[in-house]
Amino acid sequence: MYPSAPPDAYNKFSAGAPPTAPPPPAAYHQQQQQHGANMDTSRPGGGLRKWSTGLFHCMDDPGNCLITCLCPCVTFGQVADIVDKGTCPCIASGLVYGLICASTGMGCLYSCLYRSKLRAEYDLDEGECPDILVHCCCEHLALCQEYRELKNRGFDLGIGWEANMDRQRRGVAGGGAVMGAPPAIPLGMIR
């Protein structure tokens, strides 16, 4: 149906040398380290992950938005408790944040450290603005975003780190279901 091409037709368009295969992943990772790249290219998918919600999506959780607007130290304490893996309780972190805000008005300098820790823990992309700018310009929005990120990752920020870990242990021990007392079986009409 179609005319056949002459045998040398392909050769006149080729560059001459066959293309080389890309280096294997291990060699590529070593090359990146030699050039000073700070991204881990050996991770599947490579690159950083996006936040589960945007910075301005605070109305995705209106309750948290209201609490953060009225008393940001509560949201900060909840986020810090999870990010620090329970080493500093929610009340202590919130109190320190509140004191820094009240005495200097620069709580954003303290809270941006926790945003950086959260991003490092979950390989989250920093975006166009550094953490310090996000917290200094949009403190309440940043706290709400961090809260939603942890919530979307399965944490219940209202119960703290220890209770979340206990809940996770019970869930794993029960094959995915939370173990508890067996359900009561109604006996019906028995004589």
UniProtKB/Swiss-Prot annotation:
Entry keyword annotation includes S-adenosyl-L-methionine? no
> What is one GO biological process annotated to this record?
negative regulation of cell population proliferation
Q: Where in the cell is it found?
A: Membrane
Q: Where is this region: Disordered?
A: 13-44
The Low complexity compositionally biased stretches are: 27-37
Alphabetized, the UniProt keywords read: Membrane, Transmembrane, Transmembrane helix
Write down a Pfam family by its short name.
PLAC8
Tissue spec. comment? Expressed in roots, coleoptiles, stalks and silks. Detected in leaves, apical meristems, immature ears and pericarps. Highest expression in coleoptiles and silks.
Main subcellular location: membrane
Write out the GO cellular component annotations: membrane
Q: How does it sit in the membrane?
A: Single-pass membrane protein
Q: Where are the transmembrane segments?
A: 91-113
Keyword Membrane on entry: yes
Role this protein plays: Acts as a negative regulator of cell number.
- What family is this protein classified in? Belongs to the cornifelin family.
- The protein here is known as Cell number regulator 1
The lineage, from the top, is:
Eukaryota, Viridiplantae, Streptophyta, Embryophyta, Tracheophyta
The coding gene here is CNR1
